[in-house]
Amino acid sequence: ADSTRLSLAVTLFFVGCGVGNFFAGPLADALGRKPVVVGSMALYGAAAIASALSPSLTVLFISRFVWGFAAAGPRTLSQAMVRDRYSGEAMARVMTLMQTIFFLAPIVAPLIGKGFLELGGWRWTMGFGVIPAVIIAVWVLTIEETLDVENKRSLELGRVFEGFKIVAKNRVTFGYGLAVTFGFGAFYSFLGSTELVLEDIYDYGDQFFLFFSMMSVFLGLAAFVANRVLQRMSAKRLAFLAGVGLVVSSVGMVIAAVAHNGKPPFLLW
């Protein structure tokens, strides 16, 4: 029960990240990319400090939600900044390159976290979040704003909903958006429960950092391969093939889980 409650700290981070996406985009369209990223990093660092100093689980859960909310800023706006400068297949290649970097970071993160746990406990691990927040904020301040003045949009609520309506009415955009939503929903659910499953189901809790790093290697490798494939294949076809692969693998995992009473073989999982 305690491990389940503690896993909420991870889950709430991703929930906050999902909620933050609805605010980061409209704010960046009105104010520009740089101010929103820098502001997000300031909130990110403050939430990291609050998490490190939290006197109770309630405070920890709240600060983790805020932390995730702030993390949505650079995550969302990095893609927006690419769209400001690229389009078509070139944009897809840059996006997959970004995904490679995004997935490579978690390879070293568990190792750093384990090191801080050995040195000073979980509070040190939480407090470490201040360092990347400062680095990203300083770096963003040194680059040019990518959103042209003529492309800025009003922050009026009606204009914001108008933008959502335009996206919803575009069948292609809405379809891909829905697919990405379900895909990332499953992925974030997996991330939020991985440590709990390794510890309570497979008794590998002490080796979580190792398995997580291995998983990140394959994710980064997949993104790198996708970047190369996009030089010879259209983004639409690659997305279709990836979607088919996800459906087939997901169905296979469900069958394996049912066949083994909810506990599929570890190597398959």
Question: Which residues fall in each region the model found?
Answer:
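Conserved MFS/SLC helix-loop-helix module at the cytosolic interface between two early adjacent transmembrane helices
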Residues: G18-T58
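Residue-level signature of mid-helix packing/kink "hotspots" within the transmembrane helices
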Residues: F14-F22, P106-I107, S216-F224
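Cytoplasmic helix-loop-helix junction between adjacent transmembrane helices
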Residues: S63-F102
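Helix-loop-helix hairpin linking two adjacent transmembrane segments in secondary transporters
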Residues: V59, G88-E89, T96-L141
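Structural signature of the two symmetry-related core transmembrane helices
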Residues: P35-I49, V130, L238-M253
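Helix-to-loop junctions at the C-terminal end of transmembrane segments
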Residues: N21-L31, A222-K236
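Juxtamembrane intracellular "pre-TM" segments in multi-pass secondary transporters
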Residues: T146-Y176
